[in-house]
Amino acid sequence: MPSSREIRNKIKSVKNTQKITRAMEMVAASKMRKAQDRMKKARPYGEKIRNVAAHMSNASVEYRHPFLISRDSVKRVGIIVVTSDKGLCGGLNTNVLRRALNEIRTWETEGNHVDACCIGNKGLGFMSRLGTQVISQVTGLGDAPNMERLIGAVKVVLDAYTEGQLDRVYIFYNRFINTMKQMPVMEQLLPLTDDRISSEDGEARPTRAPWDYIYEPEAKPVIDDIMVRYIEALVYQAVAENMASEQSARMVAMKAASDNAGNLIDELTLIYNKSRQAAITKELSEIVGGAAAV
């Protein structure tokens, strides 16, 4: 059994750790609320640009954007993996990376080549160790998604798709369900599917819209720009969801760590009291034995 001094030092060490985890829990709770607000504020823009993109995809008959055209054969797949830069958030990153790994193995088994765009340091490190080619990356976003920093990495993927270097693009991220639940999801970004180009209530739009916009000077550059902005909005929304999930998972993980530290302190205190009681009993027995001998 360890000595009383060793047990006291252990209790002190666990208490110090508990103070840190409690502080991190409170910080994560504050950041979580802000991340949820950012996520909700991003939705109106995403809905509006989706409506515009949906109308353009059906209204303009003179030009069909490449993002809307499905390719017959798929040989090269691009993935955008959204993770956090930091750890201490439970199994959040592990879950989404496991989902991505399963899909990568399936594609490679089918003979497809996979290129990755990594948003977040954890995903970048994982893809580098896995040996997957990383064509673009963004790390150090902090506590708020920055569209200006995301655009460069996303543009590399979009250009690769437009030039035929990628035949399909998917995005992996953690969808925020509630404070206690985050779900790793995979969604197809390119080519845009019917569920992406749909009305706000989820119903598919008619094959031919009854009216169209007036394009100045022509439709092609306007549609090109809108489609790119739409994909950027989808990626931004995914990053915002992942950040809200990250702070929620970190708050829950730090609360669990604080609770476990409290339980460990109780157990160590009990061991310390038993050890101290045994030492006192031993001393009393020695005193009584010595007095009886006299």
Curated annotation (Swiss-Prot):
Q: Which Pfam families match?
A: ATP-synt
Enumerate the subcellular locations listed in this protein's record, separating them with semicolons. Answer: Cell inner membrane
Q: Which InterPro entries match?
A: ATP_synth_F1_ATPase_gsu, ATP_synth_F1_gsu, ATP_synth_F1_gsu_CS
Q: Name one GO molecular function term.
A: ATP binding
Membrane topology classification: Peripheral membrane protein
The record's GO CC annotations read:
plasma membrane; proton-transporting ATP synthase complex
Q: Name one GO biological process term.
A: proton motive force-driven plasma membrane ATP synthesis
Kindly state which keywords UniProt assigns to this record, in alphabetical order: ATP synthesis, Cell inner membrane, Cell membrane, CF(1), Hydrogen ion transport, Ion transport, Membrane, Transport
How is the quaternary structure described? F-type ATPases have 2 components, CF(1) - the catalytic core - and CF(0) - the membrane proton channel. CF(1) has five subunits: alpha(3), beta(3), gamma(1), delta(1), epsilon(1). CF(0) has three main subunits: a, b and c.
Q: Which family does it belong to?
A: Belongs to the ATPase gamma chain family.
* Stated role: Produces ATP from ADP in the presence of a proton gradient across the membrane. The gamma chain is believed to be important in regulating ATPase activity and the flow of protons through the CF(0) complex.
Q: What is this protein called?
A: ATP synthase gamma chain
